[in-house]
Amino acid sequence: MIEQLPKYMKRKLLILVTAVVMQMSFAQTESTFGDGEWFKFKMSYSGWLKAGNATLTVKETTLDNKDVYHVVGKGWTTGMIKWFFKVKDRYESYFDKTTLLPYKFIRDIDEGGHTKDIVIQFDQKDNKAYVHDKKKNTKKVFDTSPNIQDMVSTYYYLRDRLDVSKMKIGDEVRVDMFFDEENYGFKLKYLGEDIIDTDFGKIASLKFRPYVMAGRVFKEEESLTLWVSKDKNKLPLRIKADLRVGSLRADLEAFKGLKHPFRIIVDN
């Protein structure tokens, strides 16, 4: 059918198709985050006692000749809390810059004497996870779901790819995640829009309920609430968690390297 069109119409059609493809490509490549992004959080226990700090850092690098984001998350207790419950956690994820699928995950934690030192290599093509437990000196291979995510990459994947404009309050999304030697169906519930007071001022936000595994740390599946900025950055502004003993709150207190403008609501 196209071959039967006049030459000038073919040229116009080609220009139109090219323009559409360029727009689609632009929409797919305009990510919410990038190289050099850095967050710092302050944590408090049961609403008043300073508990610690956490940071998230994004760097561009290569891994096995693949262009990846390398994200490092650190968390540690401070002050009085540190004397009776010391926490020193480090999480790392190397995930593809285009697909946001992870190739390598590192979990090195010490939480009140509960320690883990694990490295996971993901084979996204053959759906395998190669788990090296350095503490136990064991190596195991597990089958994974297609397009599997790790604990860290899940957050960046949802932050970048979730289209909230198409969601209603109560809607849930599911992501296949590999955690602690098993496939885990991570779920996130949308709770609507909110305006919260922060160290930076009033911020329009989106509110979510990440489902967590109840057990040693969390009181129940719906123990966690997350607020992210209602802009292109999707900044993690606040996290509240109901623990088996007390509660924990993390608030964003510093940031740099944002890709998009950060908006604050100014009272008239």
Language-model segments: residues:
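Acidic, serine/threonine-rich low-complexity disordered tracts
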Residues: Q28-Q124, V164-N268
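Hydrophobic-ligand-binding modules of eukaryotic lipid transfer/binding families
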Residues: K10, S25-A27
